[in-house]
Amino acid sequence: MNEELAEVAASTRLAELGITLPAVPAPVAAYLPAVVSAGQVFTAGQLPFVDGHLLETGKVGAGVSPERAAELARVAALNAVAAAASVVGGVDGIRRVVKLVVFVASDPAFTGQPQVANGASELLLSVFGERGRHARSAVGVAVLPLDSPVEVELVVEASAASF
């Protein structure tokens, strides 16, 4: 394999970025944070929790700025990566990111959901490089659990060695 095309391990990228993979946030209801099926990992919706605390509440476009919401989407995406990593033996057990879904609690007039979702997408590209390129949906919704401004779901492919 061409050395220029060789991928850097996700754990190495996290260290280079100064990012520590957080503990998986505890579920707030009767579900699992992530499950593996047919070589893919599906995460539950992840909120922007840090150390057990939701960083912000409210709607984007009415109290929460789009820029702040993009930061929150990044935090929620990191929590989703942690959830996926927890069922495949660590972050290096993730072969590639397949799909990202970002739900944005939006004021009715707000239409910038894709820009909010970029916070999550950019984190995934930073951590996984080309393996972080993904399909994506950015969905505006009326309200999210706990009045969170954003919620993130991931589908990733697990590496064969993680089974």
Task: Identify what each model region corresponds to.
Residues 2-163:
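Short, polar/acidic, helix-capping and beta-turn segments at strand->helix junctions
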